[in-house]
């Protein structure tokens, strides 16, 4: 059965950076999926030690047509051996904006989903809301939730083209 926690950064004593580090510290994940509208190098550096360990099983989707995401951040993710998809909507009037992190194992998964981008401010300083979902993949609805998330992000016909 799912365990759900609410996080309101900068109003409480909980921070997205800490929760993301916890997610990335579970070394038995078979897959890590990240999606952010904006990524800056300082955001990558704040979780780089944990991400490096899981880089070979990590895929990140990063919005690029937004005047915020930096080439240095994308380069750093690539240096860590993370598979990166740069998502360009083709217009400035629509930006790629989903923010979530998924760690998926054989029997469980953790999802961090909310408003925080992968910038230092987004992970540490801004007032950001999020939910931490700890899922049991033996529960059909929870497995379907994870499978749908992974399929939606990795289906070449939807985002990654």
Where are these regions (language model features)?
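PLD/PLD-like phosphodiesterase catalytic module centered on the HKD motif
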Residues: 1-161
């Amino acid at each position: 059965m799912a365990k759900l926690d609410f996080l309101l950064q900068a109003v409480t004593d909980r921070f997205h950076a800490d929760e993301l580090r916890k997610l990335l510290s579970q070394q038995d994940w078979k897959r890590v999926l990240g999606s952010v509208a904006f990524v800056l190098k300082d955001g990558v550096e704040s979780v780089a030690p944990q991400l490096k360990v899981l880089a070979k099983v990590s895929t990140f989707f990063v919005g690029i047509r937004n005047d915020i995401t930096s080439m240095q951040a994308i380069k750093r993710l690539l240096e860590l051996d993370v598979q990166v998809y740069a998502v360009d909507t083709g217009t400035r009037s629509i930006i790629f904006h989903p923010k979530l992190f998924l760690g998926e194992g054989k029997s469980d998964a953790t999802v961090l989903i909310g408003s925080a981008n992968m910038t230092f401010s987004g992970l540490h300083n801004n007032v950001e809301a999020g939910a931490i979902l700890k899922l049991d993949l033996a529960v059909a609805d929870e497995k379907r939730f994870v499978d749908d998330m992974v399929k939606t992000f990795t289906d070449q016909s939807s985002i990654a083209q």
